[in-house]
């Protein structure tokens, strides 16, 4: 779902019940998430994540409840190691875990915005103006191509 969502269908990241879709919404404590792996992704070309949106994928999986996995090739070969490190640091600093509370604030074609444990807010998508959706008391922690993460100060 995530690999389709980042290509202009970010509304897919909110199910009809308001939670994250599929297993990640039903039972996040047991869900393991990844952007690509050696069987499906960039090396096999079976169903690769859009290469220009890989960091949006990591911004999502590393800030959301569940158990995220980082693909070796992305971390060591592709070059976004520092961006991934920043996102891992946010996750660690705020104690995000597989049972953290997720509140999806907005999910449209060009904007996904969610708050995790009341401590972290993540934005995906090309929409720059998020209006009043980011409450006071948050500051930027990480950002890149079509994603941003804020943390409570």
UniProtKB/Swiss-Prot annotation:
One Pfam family this sequence matches: Alpha-amyl_C2
Transition state stabilizer, annotated site positions: 39
Entry's cofactor comment: Binds 3 Ca(2+) ions per subunit.
Cross-referenced InterPro entries: A-amylase_bs_C, Glyco_hydro_b, Glycoside_hydrolase_SF
Any one GO biological process: polysaccharide catabolic process
Listed cofactors: Ca(2+)
Entry superkingdom: Eukaryota
Keywords: Calcium, Carbohydrate metabolism, Germination, Glycosidase, Hydrolase
First-tier enzyme category under EC: hydrolase
GO MF entries: alpha-amylase activity; calcium ion binding
Other remarks on this protein: There are at least 4 types of alpha-amylase in barley. Type B isozyme mRNA is undetectable in unstimulated cells and increases a hundred-fold after stimulation with gibberellic acid.
Gene3D superfamilies attached to this UniProt entry: Glycosidases (3.20.20.80), Golgi alpha-mannosidase II (2.60.40.1180)
Similarity-based family: Belongs to the glycosyl hydrolase 13 family.
EC number of the protein: 3.2.1.1
Protein name: Alpha-amylase type B isozyme
SUPFAM superfamilies, A to Z: (Trans)glycosidases, Glycosyl hydrolase domain
Subunit structure: Monomer.
Reaction equations catalysed: Endohydrolysis of (1->4)-alpha-D-glucosidic linkages in polysaccharides containing three or more (1->4)-alpha-linked D-glucose units
Binding sites annotated in the UniProt record for substrate: 19, 25-27, 38, 44, 123, 150
Source species of the chain: Hordeum vulgare
